[in-house]
Each structure stands twice: as structure tokens, then as C-alpha cells.
């Protein structure tokens, strides 16, 4: 895809293509509408037990796409994603007369979350309450315009939901793990069976995604103390035995397990992005673009990571260390129930950081307060890449990944985001 260099504006360290905005409503109120929904979605995962961690990639990605599509036709210099993403051929067109775009966004976001969390009554109650509270933004419009705009948002959400149902994620198939030396087996303490083994076969958003997995180089298994594999496993053991308080805190900060306390890695990055959007007071359309681009990159990265995990079936550190180094050893955080390589947190976080760097720049500092509500102190970073680096290393400190897998995952996540950037455009001026 050819890239056209266009005029850009720099706002508080952010680099975005210039936009001729339509003065439809207060930018700050509209932005607050979006960030409050993003913050709510990040919290809802705590009350949606039983959903596999990787499955939240769908929730955040499809919701972000619906949000973007619910307002994109209110901006002349932005374009729809219809026709750019696999099997998303067409979306409803907005009415030609006056629109209340905030009403459409509000309805679309609410509809998406109701779909994903319909079986959790506390989540539905929170969604209903949020939707109702945001209706004050619509008071300056006629009742007819508001109703019409809400219906449009619901139509967008319904179309995205129908599209999401065909991505293959609901295909239930039995799975028998490969057996052999060096291959993954269920891990202590719960020895949970393999989770989402066919996720790598889900439909991607963009064409030729799996060609990016050619970057991966599987570590050669060996039990020889002089081998690279033994050395990288021994590093996990040694690091865990000499963790500094800061390293241990980092392991817990990026645990992100869907266990009722954390927001998952997807909610964590969405919370971080919400803070960035508020910090820089972005126009609504730019915030929606950032949300969509980040979550789309993470969605694609998850497919790549899970395809690699179940292709190579690399043994987890806890299994190797207990068998060959110290049979009493346990990691700092609980090992997720899927193969080790590549490291998912590194893959997903580098996808998110790369996507956001393409919009915010490589030197955008950020403060992450995602978990202050559970007693974890906020963290400040000089750049988004520093955030991703720490997220990856947290899995070494936690004892659940080898450094090699973290490095390989980081490269894969970066390529996933660049693949999205090369195949999808949000701007009418870019062809």
C-alpha cells in the first residue's frame, strides 16, 4: 500500500494527521464520553469470570471498531474500515441529515458490551447505568435526531457483532496435547488443561497475517547443562531466587490475570490509553482511532502468538526447572494454561506500544495508574516502548517465561502492529 506524506500537526508531543473537524459538540464532553466507556470496559472484566484471557482480545477490538465506525462519517478526512478488513465488506450508512454523533457512540458502545457480557448481571447493570448517564450530551439535539442517531449506533454494533460471530472463535473442538520430551504439559498448582488451543486459527482482520510468524525461531530443546535451553531455564530459576522488591512488584503489576482483581492485558493497555487520551485532550475521532488501532494490533498479535504457542508447544519454566534443576521450585505468579513460546505479554504489549507510537510518537511519556484501586502504585515511563519492555520482563520476574521467548514475542508484536498499519488506513488522504 502506498503511503502519501500529508501535513501533520503536533499537539503536546503527539503526531497525528491534520483533521478539519466539524464543530458538532464540545470536544471535551465527547472525549469524556469515550474515556468513561473505556474505563468501564476495563473494569467489567473483573466481573466476567470464566472467560479465557485471550478471548478479551475480541471484546476490546470489536468494540473499538464499532466505536470508531459510529462516528467516522462525521469527519471528512477519516475513512471507514469497511472494505479494508477481512469479510467486513459493508456497514450501515448514517442518515444524511443532522446527526448527534455522541448518541450514536453511546448506543454502539453499550450494545457491544451488552453482547459480550450479557450473562453477567452486574456487568449489564453497569452498562445500563453508564448509557443512561451519558444522555445529557444529547440535550441540545431534537428528540428525533437523538433517536435516529441512537438507532444508527445500534445498527453499527449489530453489524460488527454479526461479523464477529464468523471469526472462528466459537468453534468447539477437542484437543489432545502433543506428547514428548520438551513439550508443554499442564502446570502446577491447578494443572489446568490447555486453554484456547485453536485461537491461532481464528480469522484475522488483515490479509496474510500469518506470514509474520516467519520471524519466530523456536528454541532448541536440551537438558544438557551447557545448552542454551538449560541456561535460559536456569536464568529463570536464578532470577526468581534473587528478585529485588521492585522486580517482584513488577511481576505482580503486570500479572493481569482475569482473576477478579486485574483487568487483563487488554484492559490494562486500554486503561493506559484512556489516561493518555485525557492527558493530551485529544479530539474524539483521534481518540477513537488510537483505540481501534491499538486493539486491532493486539487482536492480530494474539492470533500470531497463539498460533506459535500450539505449533511449537514449548515447555513452561516450572516444568523444566522442577524436572532438571529444583523439584521444589514454584514461580512467583501462576503460570497460564498454555504453551510457553512466544511470550504473549511481550507480543501483545509490543503490538500495543508500536501501534500507539505510530500515533503518539516514540518519546511520548506516560503514567500508568491502572491498578491504584487495588493498592498498586502508579508507574511512570519515558516512552510507550519502555512500558512494553517492562511488561515483557515482568514475565521473567514472575517465573513463567524465558528471556528468549520474551525477545521473540516483542519482535512478533511489533510486526503485528506494523502489519495492521501497512494494510489498514484510517485517513482519507492515505492510499
PLM feature segments, named:
Residues 1-25:
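Bacterial Sec-dependent N-terminal signal peptides
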